[in-house]
């Protein structure tokens, strides 16, 4: 496994990606949007680099933080595999989907009754799937207006936070960062104290990503 460095904004360095791809490379996997700072990866450019260097290598995109915020066209963007989770768009937990480009062969992890096109045997979570579908419909109804509102709120929030002395805004503004994610550091302030102070005022934030909740300390993403 080869791990790639990112630039100061959290974006994959395309020149390093090009150097890392070998004739025996079978898969390249990146996020679409970073869940901590909101950095948006140039997935189309990444795909072009991969296919130019090794056309047989597959490109997987973790779109869990991007789906619902962006209009994603896997075929047009050169994505072979795309994973999405329902709970990030206000759908039920425990449901998601994997887009598999036509012609890509994937071996199932679970064998048995052949449900879900033979990819994941076992009784389907019908209520979860229905809830996911309803969430997708709601999210993409008046989608452009919803995203513009998010962008406006994020810009206002980051502008006001930037006025506070000792504040570092880790998330960029504009197209370089997702509209729903704001990462802020406060010099000399313990995150736990700030969390409780904000909670008393009905404001709820997190001091790190959910996937690192059992590993207290400085975020590896922010360290890098």
Regions picked out by a protein language model, each given a short descriptive name:
Residues 1-224:
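Pyridoxal 5′-phosphate
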């Amino acid at each position: 496994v080869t791990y790639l460095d990112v630039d100061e904004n959290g974006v994959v360095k395309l020149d390093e990606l090009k150097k890392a791809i070998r004739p025996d490379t079978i898969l390249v996997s990146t996020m679409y949007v970073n869940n901590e700072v909101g950095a948006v990866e140039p997935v189309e450019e990444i795909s072009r680099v991969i296919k130019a260097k090794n056309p047989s290598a597959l490109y997987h995109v973790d779109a869990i933080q991007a789906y619902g915020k962006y209009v994603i066209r896997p075929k047009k963007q050169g994505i072979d595999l795309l994973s999405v989770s329902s709970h990030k768009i206000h759908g039920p937990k425990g449901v998601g989907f994997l887009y598999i480009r036509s012609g890509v062969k994937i071996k199932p992890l679970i064998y048995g009754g052949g449900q879900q096109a033979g990819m994941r045997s076992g009784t389907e979570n019908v209520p979860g799937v229905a809830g996911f579908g309803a969430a997708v419909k709601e999210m993409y109804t008046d989608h452009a207006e919803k995203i513009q509102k998010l962008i406006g709120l994020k810009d206002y929030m980051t502008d006001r936070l930037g006025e506070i002395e000792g504040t570092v805004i880790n998330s960029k503004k504009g197209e370089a960062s997702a509209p729903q994610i704001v990462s802020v550091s406060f010099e000399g302030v313990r995150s736990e104290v700030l969390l409780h102070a904000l909670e008393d005022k009905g404001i709820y934030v997190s001091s790190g990503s959910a996937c690192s909740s059992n590993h207290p300390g400085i975020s590896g993403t922010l360290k890098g």
